[in-house]
């Protein structure tokens, strides 16, 4: 895998560089919005240290991408609005990727005009998405890769797999669709785009409720603020419009890579029926139906999603056994430990992760057993010390 360093740069959809606002840490954001800080300072796990670098598309647009982990490449197309640095500060988001990064080099990127990537000179389309994905893959000299397409990244991954059958080894689709027109009625689609364009504050709140119905009120509010901070109303409206316009249903039968389709049955953003139809159109694809309403995989039963992906990739699930050293925690246990370190109660942890309070209690008890400690304070101390330094 080739890696090349570059100079940091980010910008709004149309404002000149001199107009770009900044936040502490030197992050540039679009539209003059203020980025909220995370609820508390988060400890870092050395196994999840990412490297952010930059490459250029054939059109000369600079794209920010991040790599983390080890092993063969797992390329993850942009799913929605993103910011490589800010999203990684979420302990639940970071912990969800931990098992994947243990067996794959996970590659993510910010789409043009979003996060740390430069804006695209014109309206973005599926062709734009494919050009960016290929630019990242070519820059890293990935002749063979696995793809994980989630949400809006799903049709992009599908189209790339259809166009490059010799390059894609395995394809995972989560919460995906093949025809954006079928996500909602024309009236709903038009109303959503108009609301976001005219009232981005309300629109970002509505999207947070749709994407994260099982998360706590605090988590949804924080995510809504992040959306407003890293994307302008115009950018968000155009991106949602693009989401609704994308169609790749005529390409499904051209996908030859082994394909796993994961979809939560009560997904509030992308209806389950679209995942089922998508799987039916891909030769030999396997459909796995999951419980839950949240669209994002790291909320709700995140472990079930990771487990299915690892099994499909031919990797064992990283679950501690009696022979493993103390301090080895599952992805879910790492999430709980991080939230304990934030000072959250079991009830608050359950609300944040979209699980039952008794499940949070059970996770905490197993964490204490694995770490050989007896109190929440000791768990928090372990997270602040060992997870940051080992």
Model-inferred region functions:
Residues 54-118:
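Conserved HGGG/HGGXW glycine-rich cap/lid loop of the alpha/beta-hydrolase fold
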Residues 158, 162, 168-198:
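Flexible "cap/lid" loop of the alpha/beta hydrolase fold
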Residues 285-324:
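Catalytic active-site module of serine/aspartate enzymes centered on a nucleophile-bearing elbow/loop
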Residues 265-270, 295-296:
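Acidic catalytic loop of the alpha/beta-hydrolase fold
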Residues 255, 261-263:
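Short beta-strand/loop motif that positions the catalytic acidic residue
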Residues 201-246, 251-252:
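Conserved alpha/beta-hydrolase catalytic His-Asp/Glu region
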